[in-house]
Amino acid sequence: MLRKIIRGSGFTQSEEKLIEFADDAFFGLWSYPNVYSDEGYSKNKIGKEVSDLLVIFDKDIIIFSDKAITYNKNKDPKVAWQRWFKKSVIQSCTQLFGAEKFIKDHPERLFVDKKCSVNLPIKIDNSFNFHLVAVTNNISDPAISYFDKIEKGSSATLVNIFPLNAHQCLENPFCVGDVYPDKTFVHILDETALKLLLTELNTATDFIGYLNEKERVVRERTLLVSAGEEETLAAYIMGDKTIISKEIIGNDQGMTIPEGEWKNYKTTFNYQYQLSMKKGSVFWDNLIHNFSTSILSANVGFFSEIEFSTHELGVRELAKESRQSRYYLSKNFKEKLKTTQPHLRTSRMVESIDEPGKFYLFLFFPNDSKLSYSDYRIQRISYINAYAEVA
């Protein structure tokens, strides 16, 4: 039986912004703010928060920690940086590693509310991959001010020097690295980088693909330095989802991504192409959003007796499509709809360009004015079942 799920909404302005970006990319069905465990519930009747935001999609889990620590501009930059870094990054990492361990050890003890009355609806097992993201705030303007003293025109994102661990980052203002190289990689994103990534890579497949590729090149020590997250993103997009190809670099070599890659990318045809893909695939996004909202509100019509996992599995197939594939599917749907006469029943089968062998069946079914809407829906369901069997 499907049950209404009310997700958390964040406790701070920065958390609310993070949730907004995440909902645009992952939709509510896979994005859960303020997830709790039942630790301490027996004593206080309130659970303990595990993460600020938990994204669970297919076999990937992304744990977000959000910190809104003020950077003291009145202090010496090195002193101010160290204080900010300890509270924003090191404390976030501690929270992330703790959340990762708890989720791995006790996935059945996760809840979407602090009263621990509604379990996290997606089942987690030991086959899931974990990605950790530390979201920092209030650092973009100080970073610009600091780097402008070296050279005017620097970007607002932190510099990535990946060989630096947490202790070494403390000694290098506005630089972040692979802070705990012996643990799960932590993506450290300032507010500028977060907005950029979740705007440019606003599908689950595209965003997770970027995290995987970045983790690969850093942990293989192929990428040593990047002038900013936007420069790494530019390399990823222009490299067709590969930041640094193994074919162009030796086994013992590391590369640097210089400043200016993102600005250069925005002048290319590829950038305009990606914008067109987004505009042309809004239909598919809306389709997923509508399904997601209906499932979370338990308003699915005839199928409310079916459990959450079955609904999620079906809609997940729609959401697994990349931006390019969504454009292609949307284009085919709208083209068929445009050429279909209102009184005719027709269909079109379209193959996913992401997953060869995975097909979508679009059925265009006119409403007989003699039928009630309820009867029309029943008839429509029977026809789609029949078409699917033939397909």
Predicted regions and their residues:
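Intrinsically disordered, low-complexity Ser/Thr/Pro/Gly-rich regulatory segments
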Residues: M1-V50, V55-A391
